[in-house]
Design a protein with these regions (language model features):
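A short structural micro-motif
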Residues: 67-68, 86, 99-106
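Short acidic alpha-helix initiation/capping motifs at coil-to-helix transition points
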Residues: 37-40, 70-76
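Short, structured motif recognition centered on aromatic/hydrophobic residues
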Residues: 58-66, 96-97
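Short coil/turn motifs at helix boundaries and re-entrant loops, enriched in small/polar
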Residues: 54, 70-71, 93, 105
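A general alpha-helix detector
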Residues: 12, 43, 78-79, 95-96
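Substrate/cofactor-recognition hotspot
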Residues: 59, 106-107
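Extended intrinsically disordered, low-complexity coil regions enriched in Ser, Thr, Gly, Ala
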Residues: 72-94, 109-119
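Acidic, glycine/proline-rich low-complexity segments that act as flexible tails and inter-domain linkers
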Residues: 1-56, 110-129
């Protein structure tokens, strides 16, 4: 069961954002391998791989939540890339962050928009949408 969850989680993480999955592994594998495994199994293997939402809707919800936190830039970076990889547009993601200004505050929305600007520039440099 655990190996199945891990494999499913890694597949989901790599399908959403291959570079982000590698960054997560590099950041945690040596310093906190148990946390890394829990993130892969639970977040990606159990939750993000569920059939109830299509990947685009799931990523919009995730970007909304991470924007609202206001302090989850590494996770938001991953999910901005993932959202774009599954078909969200830059305009849609920008609108999501603007909506969060009402509910999470302008500073949280600004933090997300500043990060989105970086992510968009990185993707432009790579020729990605």
């Amino acid at each position: 069961m655990e190996d199945t969850r891990y494999r499913r989680g890694m597949e989901t993480a790599r399908n959403l954002d291959p570079e982000g999955a590698e960054r997560l592994e590099a950041a945690l594998r040596d310093v906190a391998p148990d946390l890394y495994r829990h993130i892969v199994e639970f977040a990606f293997g159990d939750i993000l791989s569920r059939p109830g939402l299509d990947p685009k809707t799931r990523e919009i919800a995730t970007v909304s939540a991470l924007t609202s936190l206001g302090n989850a830039q590494p996770q938001l970076r991953y999910h901005l890339n993932a959202a774009l990889n599954v078909g969200c547009t830059r305009a849609e993601l920008t609108e999501v962050m603007m909506q969060m200004a009402v509910y999470a505050g302008i500073p949280a929305a600004l933090n997300a928009l500043y990060l989105a600007k970086e992510v968009f520039a990185e993707r432009d440099a790579k020729g990605l949408p």
